[in-house]
C-alpha cells in the first residue's frame, strides 16, 4: 500500500522494481471537483490517519498507522478525551505496518465494541476487539474511552513476515457479519491457499463471542454460509473470497450487500472486484487484471474458474512511463433525504475510488453487470477524472449524511499534517470552503501540533461582535488576538505566534483558542511544542 520516508533508498528501489507500491514524497495537489461539490476539513493535526469508521451515533473513529492511537471526531473536532485509546505492541517498520483499520460494532451502544486490524511484533497480524465506556449513547459527547484490559483477540496468527501486503479493512455487512481484507504478505502462492489466511476476505461471526477479554476462539468465528464452513481446517471455515494480492481497501454497499474490493496490482493493472457471492477466486497470482501473470506458482498450476475483475485500469492509461499506482477503494454512493450535503440522487449506486499516487477520483456505474466509467458531469477536471487532488487519501466511508468522508495521510510526510476531510454537495449549506456559512464556523488549528505559530480561521454568516483569545490549561488568558469588535460577514484569519501579552514565549503544552460571537462560544485546542 504505502511506505514512509524511513525506508532506506536501496530497499525502496528494490520494492519498486518488484512492482510493489513505494511512495515518493510529494506535496498535496489542489483539489478539483465538479460544479456544486466542495472538499471540507473536519480534523487536522493527525499523524498518518490510515483508517476511519463511523459509530452508529455519527461520531467518527480514526486510527493512526504508527502511533497506534485511536482518536475520535465529535461535532467536527477531536474529542475531549484524545486519544480514546492506544493499540500497543505494534510492528511499524517498512511503512505498511501498524494500526491498519478500525470499525465499530453495529449493535452499539448495547455492545460497545471497537475492532481493529494491526501488525504485531511477532510477525503476525491481529484482529482485536476492545470495549469502550463513557457516553455510549450521546453522539455529541467526547466522553468516550477504551476500557483498560478489555482487549479480546479474535485472530492473532495471520502471517506478516514481509512487512508489506497486509490488507487493512474491517467492515460490517448488512448481515451483521464482520468482513476483513488481508493481503498475501508478498508471498504470491498464499493467495490461493485457504488455510493460510493471506490474500483473502474473511467473513466472521462475532455475535457469539463472550463480552469479556480473552484469547482467540476461532470455531466461534465461523459464519454460517461461508463456502468452506464444514472444512476440517479451521482457517478455511473463516474464508469468504480468495485470490487477492493486496485488498487494502474495500467497502460494502448496505442496500445490496455487495462487496467492492479494490485490489492493488503488481506493475500493470489495478482492479475492482464486485461480488455478493462467496467462494470466488479472483485470480492472483495467475491473473493481473485479465492478463495472465503466471501459469504456475509454487508448483501449483492455475486452477479452473478464476474470476476476472469487474473493472480494471492500466497504469499506461494516465502515465506513459508506467508510473507507480495504488488503488484506494472508495464507496458506493447513496443519497440521504433532507441532507444538505448528500450527493444528488442521480449518483445513487455509483462507485468512486481514488489512486494514492496520482490522486484522481474516478466514478463508475453499473451497466447491466459491467462496471464502466460514469458519464461526464459539469465541471469535471477532465473527461477521465471525476476529481483530482486526492493523492495520499487512505480510506473512504459514506457518512450518515450522504457525504463522502476520507482520511488523508499527510502532506509531504510532515508530522501532524494528516487530516480527516469530506466531499459534500452544496444543497444550500456551504461551510468553510465556500460562500459565507449559514452558521459560525471555527476551523481546526493549523498546523497541529504548532511549533511557534498557529493559524486560526473562522467564518461569520453575518456581521457580528466577535472576540478571540488564547487560554492556558488552567483557564488563564494568555493572549488576546482579537479584542471584542464588530466584524464583517465572511472569513477571518488570526495567527498566534506562541507568545503571551508581554511578548514572551509560552511553555509547551495544550492551549485553548476561544472564539466568542454574539454570546455564543466556540473553542479549538492548540497543542504547542518547541
Q: Model regions: which residues?
A:
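Asp-box/WD-like beta-propeller blade repeats and closely related beta-sheet repeat scaffolds
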Residues: 126-171
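Surface loop/turn motifs at the tips and blade-to-blade linkers of beta-strand repeat domains
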Residues: 41-47, 84-94, 155-161, 239-242, ...
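A short helix->beta-strand "capping" segment at the edge of beta-propeller domains
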Residues: 30-46, 147-151
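C-terminal tail/sorting-segment detector
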Residues: 454, 480, 485, 495, ...
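Short, glycine-anchored, charge-dense loop/turn motifs used at functional sites
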Residues: 176, 402, 470-478, 511
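Beta-propeller domain segments
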Residues: 32, 68, 97-99, 107-109, ...
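Residue-level detector of functionally pivotal "anchor" positions at catalytic/ligand-binding pockets or at interdomain
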Residues: 426-446, 461, 477-478, 521, ...
